[in-house]
UniProtKB/Swiss-Prot annotation:
Pathway the protein takes part in: Isoprenoid biosynthesis; isopentenyl diphosphate biosynthesis via DXP pathway; isopentenyl diphosphate from 1-deoxy-D-xylulose 5-phosphate: step 3/6
Pfam families assigned: GHMP_kinases_C, GHMP_kinases_N
Keyword rRNA-binding: no
Residues annotated as catalytic: 11, 136
Organism domain of life: Bacteria
Signal sequence interval, chain numbering: none
GO biological process: isopentenyl diphosphate biosynthetic process, methylerythritol 4-phosphate pathway; terpenoid biosynthetic process
E.C. numbers: 2.7.1.148
GO MF annotation: an example: 4-(cytidine 5'-diphospho)-2-C-methyl-D-erythritol kinase activity
PANTHER family hit by this protein: 4-DIPHOSPHOCYTIDYL-2-C-METHYL-D-ERYTHRITOL KINASE, CHLOROPLASTIC
Function: Catalyzes the phosphorylation of the position 2 hydroxy group of 4-diphosphocytidyl-2C-methyl-D-erythritol.
Known catalytic reactions: 4-CDP-2-C-methyl-D-erythritol + ATP = 4-CDP-2-C-methyl-D-erythritol 2-phosphate + ADP + H(+)
Name of the protein in question: 4-diphosphocytidyl-2-C-methyl-D-erythritol kinase
């Protein structure tokens, strides 16, 4: 049996506050997650020999460090299944962009192989397997827009209004660990409540506490923020960056902004009097109400 074109959507952190740090070094966060329709796709083919093989390569990521492979092996160990899988992956979500691409791929692997192998784990059981893979993995198994606390595992579903987004990737990759270990990172933001978050338009609420650190360390990102502001876009960083996003009421408005930005970049590239930061990605996306695989799991 084979599962083709299984989606792994990107996420946005609509805000991200660092409210403390545990004794073990993990940071305590408050954030709101929303999925968007920018997505990787995976393919899963069952194997009778129990092996986990990957029919793709990720630059700089060894198979032993690949979250997809680790997720598959974690599900094998937890269930005792003797089945294996050959896995394909088509990347569309930028790596090192703060959009949760690797975490989403891992969650989709848990969900899809649970279905392919017939292992029958519940959502809560899959979320328990997800957390050791990374703090962002559980929300993709949770499958809904969520207000998150703790290290990201304490999730409460929230209903968000329809929205679209313009996602921009500056010409930089940001290692998450380096940002969280920066001595200048603010780690004592006052706690907020879900009611606080829902009382304001989502793009007006809070901030991303990681953003000042990234802007200071990565001129490509700070330059992109300035350039976009000069061209009429107020953006916020997702996760630890480097991707930035602006919110719009409708997808046509986000598409128009995408077209205007790319047209301006083309003009700037042909003249000596104008410059642009050189984006790797400019993508209009729709905010999702839930994960496309949410109904693949028994609650």
């Amino acid at each position: 049996m084979t599962l083709y074109d299984v989606p792994a959507p990107a996420k946005l952190n609509l805000f991200l506050h660092v409210v403390g740090r545990r004794a073990d070094g993990y940071h305590l966060l408050q954030t709101a997650f929303r999925f968007i329709d920018l997505a990787d796709t995976l393919h899963f083919e069952a194997r009778a020999d129990g092996a986990i093989g990957r029919a793709y390569e990720l630059p700089g990521v060894a198979e032993s460090d690949d979250l997809v492979v680790r997720a598959a092996r974690s599900l094998q160990r937890a269930t005792g299944t003797r089945q294996g899988a050959q896995i394909g992956l088509h990347k569309r979500i930028p790596q090192g962009g703060g959009l949760g691409g690797g975490s989403s791929d891992a969650a989709t692997t848990l969900i899809a192989l649970n279905r392919l192998w017939g292992t029958g784990l519940s959502r809560s059981q899959l979320m328990q397997l997800a957390l050791p893979l990374g703090a962002d993995v559980p929300v993709f198994v949770f499958g809904q827009s969520a207000f998150a606390q703790g290290v990201g595992e304490d999730l409460t579903a929230v209903a968000l209004p329809p929205a679209a987004y313009l996602v921009v990737q500056p010409d930089a990759g940001v290692p998450t660990a380096a940002i969280f270990s920066d001595p200048d990172l603010t780690r004592d933001c006052a706690s907020v409540t879900i009611a606080d978050f829902l009382a304001l338009p989502t793009f007006c609420f809070g901030r991303n506490d990681l953003e000042p650190v990234v802007l200071r360390r990565y001129p490509e990102v700070s330059g992109a923020v300035r350039w976009l502001f000069e061209h009429g876009l107020r953006v916020r960083m997702s996760g630890s960056g480097a991707c930035l996003f602006a919110e719009f009421p409708t997808l046509p408005e986000a598409v128009l902004a995408q077209e205007e930005i790319t047209a301006t970049m083309r003009v700037a590239g042909k003249t000596t009097s104008h410059t642009h930061p050189g984006f790797r990605l400019v993508q209009a996306s729709t905010g999702l109400t839930e994960h496309p695989l949410r109904n693949w799991i028994a609650s």
